[in-house]
Curated annotation (Swiss-Prot):
Sequence similarity: Belongs to the peptidase S24 family.
Coiled-coil residues: none
InterPro entries membership: LexA, LexA-like, LexA/Signal_pep-like_sf, LexA_DNA-bd_dom, LexA_repressor, Peptidase_S24_LexA, Peptidase_S24_S26A/B/C, WH-like_DNA-bd_sf
Gene (UniProt): lexA
Native species: Burkholderia thailandensis (strain ATCC 700388 / DSM 13276 / CCUG 48851 / CIP 106301 / E264)
Physiological role: Represses a number of genes involved in the response to DNA damage (SOS response), including recA and lexA. In the presence of single-stranded DNA, RecA interacts with LexA causing an autocatalytic cleavage which disrupts the DNA-binding part of LexA, leading to derepression of the SOS regulon and eventually DNA repair.
HAMAP family found in the cross-reference section: LexA (MF_00015)
Known partners and oligomeric status: Homodimer.
EC number: 3.4.21.88
Protein name as it appears in the record: LexA repressor
Length: 215
């Protein structure tokens, strides 16, 4: 059994909670802020120590490139055939026309070859984020959100959903009589959707994030 120091265990537990809650790991800056480190460099030192002990894997050049290893009960651990471990080819979805499938050919601007270690689970596509409604969850305008197609999501997960003619990224919160789509920015209002609404459709859950300049 791998023995971690108390501080390393705190970092490891924080990473695991972040993945379970939002679908992707925290940045070095977020780890430092949460655990009271003096700087992101201190978080980086603990991450490298965890990587040396074989409990996480780090992807070079990506602030969220952290993957948990060796967890038999971890639903977020990425498992792929050996031939797929080198890279994933993911379509990048730009603007989505009303009434047409997200992965319709006209929405795909290009494909990216991605390291699987960037993601908490195998994604199906990348969605270019527009706006700052999820800013406080670390999701910014222009980011590429990795999305796994799902018909259902757990309470608290960050989701991609259709709402009328729009596609939106929000945190899902179940409420009596429906669901609330939570914005992670006080400048934006939350959206309540009644159960059975024909205007609402879940498209998938967030499983990772790529920021231009870090890719």
């Amino acid at each position: 059994m791998i023995k971690l120091t108390a501080r390393q265990q705190q970092v490891f537990d924080l990473i695991r909670r972040a993945i379970e809650r939002s679908g992707f790991p925290p940045t070095r800056a977020e780890i430092a802020a949460e655990l009271g480190f003096s700087s992101p460099n201190a978080a980086e030192e603990h991450l490298r120590a965890l990587a040396r002990k074989g409990v996480i894997e780090l992807a070079a050049g990506a602030s969220r490139g952290i993957r948990l290893l060796g967890l038999d009960d971890a639903p977020h651990q990425l498992t792929l055939p050996h031939a797929a471990l080198m890279q994933l080819s993911l379509p990048l979805v730009g603007r989505v026309a009303a009434g047409s499938p997200i992965l319709a050919q006209e929405h795909i601007s290009q494909h990216y070859a991605c390291d699987p270690a960037l993601f908490s689970s195998k994604p199906d596509y990348l969605l270019k984020v527009r706006g700052l409604s999820m800013r406080d969850a670390g999701i910014l305008d222009g980011d590429l959100l990795a999305v796994q197609k799902r018909a259902e999501a757990k309470d608290g997960q960050i989701i991609v959903a259709r709402l009328g003619d729009d596609v939106t990224v929000k945190r899902l919160k179940r409420r009596p009589g429906g669901v609330e789509l939570i914005a992670e920015n006080p400048d934006y209002e939350n959206i309540f959707v009644k159960a059975g609404s024909a205007e609402f459709a879940l498209e998938g859950i967030a499983v990772g994030l790529i920021r231009p300049g870090e890719f």
